Amino acid sequence: KVKILLIKFYRVFILITKDIIRDKVYELYKEAVIVLGDDVKESLENALKIEEHDLAKLNIEAILKNIELAEQKGIPMCQDTGLPVVFVKLGNVEVENLRQGIEEGIKKATEEIPIRPNIVDPLSRKNTNINVGDYIPPIDIELIDEDYLEITILPKGFGSENNNAMKMALPAEGIEGIKEFVVI
């Protein structure tokens, strides 16, 4: 489900406004949750061709049909779109209100696509209903010595991270005890 999209704004002696950033972030986020990369689709189609078990084939067929319907109807492939993670490469360009533009693009996508509002305040547990909040989305900014601004959006799904386990190993269990726990 991981899809990374980016947009580059090259320096052409203009101000990259908050509104430009908002609109591009909206477009990127929308595409990221609706359109799956051709390489992933091809991998699923290849898996379907070589799969021998009927139940597994049915599941792969259902996934491929879901991908097709999402693109046709313009709706997210999965109801769990997770957390939008934003990566920015900021070069020698003039940018207006970068964080605000990103947050407004995420909010617009949440309301218009629509995307399920997943984000809650870490202390109150109150849902923001717009997928933005204090330090959300996380934005990683890398300063570069180039003449462009690049924005990449990665919808980080919450599903796979729900499965975890912890064990306090006894010293007598040694490495074998650790291996046994990890392999289980």
Language-model features: locations:
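Short, Lys/Arg-enriched N-terminal segments with co-localized hydrophobic residues
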Residues: 1-14
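Non-transmembrane, aqueous-exposed alpha-helical and coiled segments at domain scale
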Residues: 14-184
